């Protein structure tokens, strides 16, 4: 029994990458997953890979005093786990956010080396009793944070919009993702819907091939994201909540 407990403590924790084309509700899905997993007692660090739309001011727009930043941590001379932790904003008791801060962008800090990015994910994985959810960008070729997250992740949730944009993105990125380092065949590929126009689910599934499921459009989730309350408010939508629960169970089943 004691040996099992020691092994459990030594196990590295999960990294989950939420990746996909623009407009596929990556951020909404990442935050919804974080909230659900936190409600089950899992500690979560949300990593925002986007430097053009930093996650922190989106997820917690009323926070004005926190001066920490992923960029600040990555550019620090004394980069270590303590420096990472100092730059995490605790949005709830169980969910912390590590991202660029308001009015920051890729030019705010010095260019970050690949070695530093590698070290970041290694340090995060070793954080005790914590899983990591990375809100990725759509550009795996240009974003080091996104590329390393997708390579390193135990679970990659790929979101594709049920339209021409999603189909074209899928065809464009597949040659890159076919590289062995991305374990593309293990991706959990989800088709996401919007309310803009009627979408042909059957035709798009046939065109895209391997699709694990769909994420319905949820007006309340969109509203709460816009209000910056998605981490703290429960969404009253049974179909949407069932989908998020199913995704979370895929992530948590090996723990």
Role assignments for model-derived ranges:
Residues 13-79, 131, 136:
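Walker A/P-loop NTP-binding active-site region of P-loop NTPases
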Residues 112-118, 171-196, 233:
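P-loop/Walker A phosphate-binding loop and immediately adjacent motor/lid segment at beta-alpha junctions
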Residues 128, 143-163:
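Inter-motif core of Ras-like GTPase G domains
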Residues 46-126, 226:
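P-loop/Walker-type NTP enzyme "switch/lid" segment
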Residues 226-255:
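NTP-binding/hydrolysis catalytic cores, primarily Walker-type P-loop NTPases
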Residues 1-10:
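Pre-Walker A adenine-sensing motif
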Residues 18, 47, 99-100, 133-135, ...:
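Conserved beta-strand segments of the P-loop GTPase G domain that flank and frequently precede/overlap
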Residues 191-234:
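Beta-strand-loop-alpha "switch" segments that mediate conformational coupling across diverse proteins
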